[in-house]
Curated annotation (Swiss-Prot):
Species this protein is from: Xenopus tropicalis (Western clawed frog)
Polar residues: compositionally biased ranges: 209-232, 364-383, 947-956
Protein's UniProt keywords contain Secreted: yes
Segments for region (Disordered): 69-108, 187-235, 347-402, 490-518, 550-606, 654-692, 942-967, 987-1009
Name of this protein: Large proline-rich protein bag6
PANTHER family: LARGE PROLINE-RICH PROTEIN BAG6 (PTHR15204:SF0)
Cystine connections: none
This protein's record includes keyword Nucleus: yes
């Protein structure tokens, strides 16, 4: 039999199989073609799921279409692993090569919303072989409040339980120590030149071994029966005995080690051989102590529960991931660990393969506070200027480390823990970066050359607010305190700084900042733009919650090292990767006096911060004179991109509000008389110190590329249009083609034009005050307004005014409907007020588009759109008695009406964002009531004569958009419907009200005389509602096959109803082609009876050819095709 399988991506595949084959065998047969394993396939035919044990012929699917969907992965259930804490619970894992999403507990009903995604293979693309074969496992807490998702990127290990891993790790470390002791006891002195390299290799081996427990713990649960995986206490005793023997062998060298260090301060070491021998003992004994400490840490968390039944085994009290450092993500090497209430936490370990980790942030070194304290108590601390990592030559490369990403879903009190470290690989950079520390209740600080330390905090705060708003579906009030941006200028010393100690008092959040070391100066524009792009893009991919308020930064040079902090004391299930969350304060270490950068670097930094801050003057002069920091306070605006706006605003002197992308060149939407805010007041010209626009463009493009990198596989250049981007993601090719189901009329065509010509980069630049995209779009806008707005008429003031009136009259019903549920001032006619206001604004904007041809086109158009927006908000706020909530509800209600087919979660997020933006926008309203009084229309005012004379004119008599208010086609009417109206003349003109033919001349609405007068408006309203109804999409094969035969007969058509003019019009819209003559001329030529007949003949001939070539076609089975396509209809 022949079976067609249709997948969710609308692809169909035809298979020829034996009729006796079972459903299970059929799944196996097609699995290689569809790319879905048999156990995950779900075959559906006529609404029923095909059972695997039945034969395919029982379902009568020969020649039919079967729908194939992928079965969701089963929910993983944790199994108990002994009387231990939640971290020792044995996880239940699911192996997958493509990193599928692991099962998660119930996400608090409707409070869950996804505001960002990331593609793991894309993020891990820079890790080479280490990113091959990822495995996913989950661990649930005892109370069900946490879910840890472990993504293991290392190879499968033979051991399966963490206690076993701890013992194996300790044994391997002891073997390393024994090899070092062998060298101490019998290694010739002449081989000491190779000791640093050997030490580095040994350290690399130990580091890879030490990270094995964290990797291995993720594989727990993959084997349900592994009694030997849990070690017995006797095995622990054997390891402890081995530790004792190693300590005994090390004891004499420890004695010599102490003697050398006690005299190291003053000894001259004139004998070179003696000095080299002492140095060798210091190096090897120090390495032995490090390994010995790691071994003690590995086994110190092992416990035995004596109250459990025998045979007893060991368990751990805290996982090894408690000690490991964060993982290095791509783009500027940003290690990031994030814990978000009701979202996700990411931690991990490892570095890039070719990167030399320093002693303070290497992933293999346990950085918990307990381990350094123990290490410092057992060893003599190094001198002030000594760097422990100096023993490792730059040419040594450590062994690859296992890469593990740990994602924790937290459903309790929100906690934020972030650790960032931009490692410097250039000359003069820090070679030893101390481990960051955490303060309880403080704010996160990120120190980067040329960037504000609270950059990510500001952005993440904004994103989190929107995530919470979307999750709750409610508005969120403004912040209690405005965020503070502290910009710290780093120095660029030409020699290593003299280390010193400086302590600063705790900041408002109760935390201070560790600022050790020194950094190089800022790089060029290209590298800095890439660094900013990576930073912002990585953050926007992972929503986070940060602490309220800010922290003080010391007046000293900064290093690419940040602190970790916690903003909640009630959530203790997750800890930072570097320190415990119980610490409350820590000292601030900064470099001593450092030289000022050269004038060129200082001037470049001044230009950079001038561009980022958008300020020039006294603030920048502080930087030029050497002042290390400046604090800028901005309003607390919880908006999605407010942090990006305040930092990356390149040409403005004050923070400017933004909104979700809506083109500033676009007039208010046709179906909404209350457009959402597109941009605030126009920005002034760029300051002289600002960087060129290309820098801003590269930053924006890099941010979007980083955010959408996993989705933009087809185009990484940032030039892909919005329409192409959405069409590629949705898999549909008619989203922005005005037809019966899409946006129609003038506004639909305008939206199509904008989406096909603007990229996401262009839209973000518009929202930030850059008018260059509008300037580039000038030819297309002018041509569009001439054809679609004026219909090839001359752009005279009278024609423009008539076109504006005809266009806005179609919005009357929408305006009346939108303001019906709110309280309006008693003496204000809000419908006429909005209509005439929109007419005036359209007149201004259209006149500018059609007549302005100089270089100020884009900037002036942006200013006019911004001014129109603010005036519209102020005008309606006055009409609604100053009630901001009423104005917000009008806008949100219109959005909901337009988004009936959109996900409610997304609609809730959009309305929440707009509500918050409106609160800020209305609070900064630059338009006064006196300025909008001229637009207000009172009840009882005599309307203008043209409007009065056009109220009763019928719709059917007006050519192409020359409609009036009551009988005009609604904005959902397609352009094709309008094109079939009878022509008035060969040359299109803008009709005036006096030129409308009377009702007696046309007889188009003779039905109005035969019905009671009170029914006329009801019938007209019903006619308009019917025009807005979407055409039913074509039914699927499965639906038609399961439909009763009688109903199927009643639905059979009588051949194609598509006329030639309709087909050509749709083809023009799909391809963007424009006629050389007017649209009316093309329509008249296509309506010719001879052309229609030829078109009908060609259409039937094409269908006949298709039927002849179709092997599945049978004239006996489909007899109606003869009558429909071969006979004379």
């Amino acid at each position: 039999m022949e079976v067609t399988v249709k997948t969710l991506d609308s692809q169909t595949r035809t298979f020829t199989v034996d009729a006796e084959i079972t459903v299970k065998e059929f799944k196996t047969h097609i699995s290689s073609d569809v790319g879905i394993s048999p156990e995950k396939q779900r075959l559906i035919y006529q609404g029923r799921v095909l059972q695997e044990d039945k034969k395919l012929k029982e379902y009568n699917v020969d020649g039919k279409v079967i729908h194939l969907v992928e079965r969701a992965p089963p929910q993983t259930q944790p199994s108990t692993g002994g009387p231990s804490t939640s971290s020792s619970t044995s996880p239940s894992s699911s192996n997958a090569a493509n990193v599928p999403g692991a099962g998660a507990p119930e996400r608090n009903g409707n409070s869950y919303v996804m505001v960002g995604t990331f593609n793991l293979p894309h993020v891990m693309s820079g890790l080479g072989e280490a990113s091959r074969g990822p495995r996913v496992s989950t661990v649930s807490g005892n109370d069900g409040s946490t879910l840890d998702v472990h993504i293991n990127l290392d190879q499968q290990l033979p051991v399966q339980s963490e206690p076993r891993v701890r013992l194996v790790l300790a044994q391997q470390i002891l073997q390393d120590i024994q090899r070092i002791l062998d060298r101490l006891e019998g290694q010739p002195v002449n081989e000491q030149t190779a000791e640093p390299m050997d030490t580095a290799v040994s350290e690399g081996e130990a580091s890879s071994r030490e990270t094995l427990p964290q990797t291995t713990q993720n594989t727990d649960g993959q084997s349900n029966t592994a009694p030997t995986s849990h070690p017995s206490p006797s095995e622990y005793v054997e390891v402890l005995q081995s530790l004792s023997r190693v300590e005994e062998r090390l004891a004499p060298f420890m004695q010599r080690y102490r003697e050398i260090l006690s005299s190291a301060t003053s000894d001259a070491y004139e004998n070179q051989e003696e000095r080299e021998q002492s140095q060798r003992i210091i190096n090897l004994v120090g390495e032995s102590l490090r390994l010995l400490g790691n071994a003690l840490v590995a086994v110190s968390d092992l416990r035995c529960n004596l109250s459990s039944a025998s045979p007893r085994h060991l368990h751990v009290v805290r996982p090894m991931s408690h000690y490991t450092g964060p993982m290095l993500l791509q783009q500027a090497a940003i290690p990031i660990q994030i814990n978000v209430g009701t979202t996700v936490t990411m931690t991990g370990n490892g570095t890039h393969a070719g990167q030399m980790p320093s002693d303070g942030n290497a992933a293999h070194t346990p950085t918990n506070t307990s381990e350094p304290q123990r290490s410092n108590s057992d060893n003599q601390p190094p001198s002030s200027g000594e760097r422990p990592a100096s023993e490792i030559p730059p040419t040594s490369v450590p062994h690859p480390h296992p890469r593990v990403v740990r994602i924790t879903h937290q459903t309790v009190e929100p906690v934020m823990m972030m650790h960032m470290n931009i490692q410097d690989s250039g000359p003069g950079g820090p070679t030893n970066i101390p481990p960051p520390t955490a303060g309880h209740g403080g704010s996160a600080h990120i120190h980067m050359p040329g960037l504000p330390p609270e950059f990510m905090q500001a952005i993440s705060h904004q994103i989190t607010q929107q995530a919470v708003a979307a999750a709750s579906g409610q508005q969120i009030p403004g912040f209690q305190a405005p965020p503070r941006f502290v910009f710290t200028r780093p120095a660029a010393p030409s020699f290593p700084p003299q280390p010193g100690v400086a302590t600063t008092p705790p900041g408002p959040g109760g935390a201070t900042t560790a600022v050790p070391g020194a950094t190089v100066g800022p790089a060029g524009n290209a590298s800095l733009a890439q660094m900013i792009s990576g930073l912002v893009g990585q953050l926007l991919m992972h929503p986070v919650i940060v602490a309220q308020g800010g922290s003080n930064t010391p007046s000293s040079t900064s290093t690419p090292t940040s602190t970790s902090s916690s903003s909640s004391s009630s959530s203790s299930t997750v800890t930072t990767s570097t320190t415990t969350t119980s610490s409350t304060s820590f000292p601030t270490v900064s470099s001593g006096p450092s030289p000022q950068p050269p004038p060129g670097t200082d001037q470049h930094l001044s230009q950079l911060l001038g561009s980022l801050l958008g300020t020039a003057g006294s603030g920048m002069s502080n930087f030029a004179m050497g002042s290390p920091s400046i604090t800028v306070t901005v309003p607390g605006m919880p908006a999605f991109l407010q942090g990006v706006t305040d930092i990356l605003q390149a040409t403005q002197t004050v923070p400017v509000s933004t909104s979700p992308p809506q083109s500033a060149s676009q007039a208010p939407p046709p179906s909404s008389p209350s457009p959402p805010p597109a941009h605030s007041s126009p920005p002034p010209a760029a300051a002289p110190e600002s960087l060129p626009p290309e820098f801003f463009t590269s930053v924006v493009q890099g941010v979007l590329s980083s955010m959408l990198g996993s989705l933009s596989a087809a185009d990484q250049s940032g030039t892909e249009s919005i329409a192409a981007f959405i069409q590629r993601l949705s898999g549909s090719h008619n989203i922005f083609q005005p037809d019966a189901e899409g946006p129609g009329g003038f506004f639909g065509d305008l939206l199509t034009l904008i989406c096909h010509n603007f990229s996401l980069v262009d839209m973000v630049m518009l929202l930030h005050g850059h008018s260059q995209p509008l300037q580039n779009l000038q030819p297309q806008l002018r041509s569009f307004f001439l054809q679609e707005y004026l219909h090839q008429a001359d752009p005279t003031p009278n024609n423009i005014q008539m076109a504006s009136r005809n266009l806005t009259n179609g919005l009357e019903e929408y305006i009346r409907e939108s303001f019906a549920s709110v309280t309006v001032r008693d003496d204000v006619d809000i419908t006429r007020t909005n209509l005439e206001f929109l007419q005036d604004q359209f007149n201004r904007i259209t006149t500018h588009i059609l007549h302005c041809a100089d270089s100020t086109f884009g900037q002036r158009l942006l200013e006019m759109c911004n001014q129109s927006l603010f005036e519209w908000l102020a005008l309606n706020l006055y009409c609604l008695r100053g009630d901001q909530s009423a104005l917000t509800s009008v806008i949100n209600e219109r959005i909901r009406r337009l988004s009936l087919d959109v996900s409610p979660v997304l609609v809730s997020w959009v309305t929440s964002v707009l509500s918050l933006r409106l609160q800020v926008l209305l609070g900064q309203m630059p338009v006064t009531e006196g300025e909008i009084q001229r637009h207000i229309r009172r009840v009882g005012d005599v309307p203008q004569a043209p409007e009065a004379s056009s109220q009763d004119q019928p719709m059917e008599t007006t050519p192409v958009d020359c409609q009036n208010g009551a009988a005009s086609p609604v904005p959902a009417t397609t352009v094709e419907e309008v094109l079939f109206l009878p022509p008035q003349s060969s040359v299109p003109t803008i009709c005036t009200d006096s030129e409308h033919p009377t009702q007696e001349d046309t007889g188009s609405e003779q039905w109005a005389a035969s019905v009671p007068p009170e029914w006329v408006p009801v019938i007209r309203q019903d006619m308009q509602n019917q025009r807005k109804m979407k055409q039913q999409p074509p039914l699927s094969d499965a639906y038609l096959s399961g439909m009763p035969a009688k109903r199927r007969k009643t639905m059979q058509g009588e051949g194609p109803h598509l006329s030639l003019s309709e087909a050509v019009s749709r083809a023009m819209k799909a391809t963007g082609a424009k006629p050389e003559s007017s649209t009316d001329c093309v329509r008249r030529e296509l309506d010719n009876s001879e052309a229609q007949g030829r078109y009908r003949e060609q259409l039937c001939q094409d269908i006949q050819n298709i039927l002849q070539d179709n092997e599945s076609y049978s004239a006996q089975r489909f007899p109606n095709t003869q009558r429909a396509f071969r006979g004379d209809p």
